[in-house]
């Protein structure tokens, strides 16, 4: 499930009476989340909204805010909570020999997704790709609704994998449903979230090779540090945190585990039209 963010925004803008203006915040709240303010501002720069730019003023006095809206972002949050309730946080797979990595690159409104599968020696043996037009911008906490359709299409294209590492968070998310969890539950695959930036939480006391990531008094992930830089690992679905950490450490050669590093590289090459299996530096 996702929404066409731009269609929803257009419906709101068309409700503004002649002679009235609104604010970006009121539009974001009508969409269902004030954190969408930046996405609203970016959307208004698009050519399709040129007609509406004079209708929005952040400093407007007595702005119009009596919108009729289903608040679609609230529906997406409810879906995240439902998906989160279905997460399995123990190892529900037989082996972890074929490890997949998934990532997405963008050019404008087009997503270039790649799923690559590595063997036990961390050599890429198969990849699948998907090119999908997106109609949902980046909004903090809602990344899956932008990226999951393309990622899931790419993942469905590979013949076999045991565990999938996704470039995005799993349970280390405000609603315990980052991209890795979203994809894992929807495809019923063992998934691990791998991210270069923290979304929630604080670091706890270091353990054996990793540091717990704590959010709301719960360990939601782990921080692995290499050369002073951290990578954030979390359960996506059907994997325990301990196993997620072990697999991340086993495949870590640079900052990112190899499956994600390969996926990131190949997604960029797909976007540029030059994808191929050649050894990364």
Task: Give residue spans per PLM region.
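Catalytic-site beta-strand/loop segments enriched in glycine and acidic/polar residues
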Residues: 6, 10-13, 149-183, 187-189
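Hydrophobic/aromatic beta-strand patches that form the interior of the parallel beta-sheet core
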Residues: 56, 100-102, 165, 192
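Glycine-rich nucleotide phosphate-binding loop and flanking beta-alpha elements
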Residues: 108, 171-172, 198
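A glycine-rich, hydrophobic loop/mini-helix early in the fold
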Residues: 107-159
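Two-metal-ion RNase H-like nuclease active-site motif
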Residues: 97-107
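C-terminal binding/interaction regions
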Residues: 67-93, 124-127, 148-149, 153, ...
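Short, acidic/small-residue loops that bind anionic groups at enzyme active sites
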Residues: 50-51, 180-202
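Nucleic acid-binding interface residues in structured DNA/RNA-binding domains
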Residues: 2-74
């Amino acid at each position: 499930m996702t929404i066409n963010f731009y269609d929803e925004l257009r419906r709101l803008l068309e409700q503004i009476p002649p002679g009235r203006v609104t604010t970006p915040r009121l539009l974001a709240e009508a969409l269902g989340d004030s954190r969408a303010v930046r996405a609203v501002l970016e959307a208004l720069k698009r050519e399709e909204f040129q007609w509406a730019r004079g209708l929005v003023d952040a400093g407007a006095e007595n702005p119009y805010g009596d919108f009729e809206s289903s608040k679609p972002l609230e529906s997406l949050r409810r879906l995240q909570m439902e998906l989160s309730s279905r997460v399995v946080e123990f190892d529900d797979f037989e082996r972890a020999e074929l490890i997949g990595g998934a990532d997405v690159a963008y050019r404008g409104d087009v997503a270039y997704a790649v799923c690559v599968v590595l063997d036990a020696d961390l050599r890429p043996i198969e990849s699948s790709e998907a090119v999908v037009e997106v109609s949902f911008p980046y909004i903090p906490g809602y990344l899956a609704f932008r990226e999951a359709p393309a990622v899931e299409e790419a993942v469905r294209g590979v013949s076999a994998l045991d565990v999938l590492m996704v470039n995005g968070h799993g349970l280390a998310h405000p609603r315990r449903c980052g991209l890795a969890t979203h994809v894992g539950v929807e495809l019923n695959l063992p998934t691990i979230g791998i991210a270069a930036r923290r979304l929630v939480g604080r670091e706890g006391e270091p353990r054996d090779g990793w540091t717990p990531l704590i959010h709301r008094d719960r360990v939601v992930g782990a921080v692995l540090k290499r050369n002073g830089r951290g990578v954030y690992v979390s359960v996506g679905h059907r994997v325990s945190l301990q196993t997620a950490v072990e697999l991340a450490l086993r495949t870590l050669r640079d900052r990112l585990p190899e499956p994600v590093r390969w996926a990131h590289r190949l997604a960029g090459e797909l976007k540029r039209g030059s994808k191929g299996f050649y050894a990364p530096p």
